[in-house]
Amino acid sequence: MSQYLIRHNEPLEEDELVFLQKKEQRELKQYYRFFRILMFLSFILPFAGTWYSASDGNPDPFTPGKFFAVTGILLSISGFVTWVGYRRGPGKLHYDITHRTKTIEQTHISRKVYMPQNNTYHFYLNSPNMLSIEVNNTDYHRMKEGDEVNIEYTTKAKIYLGYF
């Protein structure tokens, strides 16, 4: 049994592409919600600081320079956080959709596990990308440890698509 990593890219099938597009829509919706919350806080927190300063008896709680400096810093932090969040989440998914490729990796079964709690069957793999996959009853009993299995996942986002 060879332990070399064998993988290649193939084009996405139509149903896989539709699945990824729906997943991208859901992730973008969450991303934009998070973005709006950060932008809202970037403008509200300086006002809250001004109100707090006024409640302490400060005769001139609002100074435009300080207000815009704090707002600018918060906007910069929010912008950086949302950019990193996009690059790590929806950005990778968008890359996979636009390039329309998936990776097929040839790996071997290192261990078979039955989970009686939820009546599922799993193969643990020798793959650096997937630790385990859920399989059906037939494949679980047909294949044995050391057998070769091919797994499919998106190239950049590493979203599991199936096995054969």
Model segments located where?
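Cytosolic juxtamembrane N-terminal segments of multi-pass membrane proteins
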Residues: M1-R33
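N-terminal topogenic membrane-targeting module
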Residues: E14, F19-Q21, Y95-T103
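Alpha-helical transmembrane spans
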Residues: K22-I97
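Structural detector for short beta-strands of small beta-barrel domains
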Residues: D96-Q117, N150
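Short aromatic-glycine-enriched beta-strand elements
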Residues: Y114-N126
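Short acidic, S/G/P-rich loop/turn micro-motifs used as interaction or catalytic elements
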Residues: Y114-P116, S132, Y140
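Short, structured beta-strand/loop micro-motifs enriched in basic residues and often containing a Trp
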Residues: N126-V135
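A membrane-cytosol interface segment of integral membrane proteins
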Residues: V135-F164
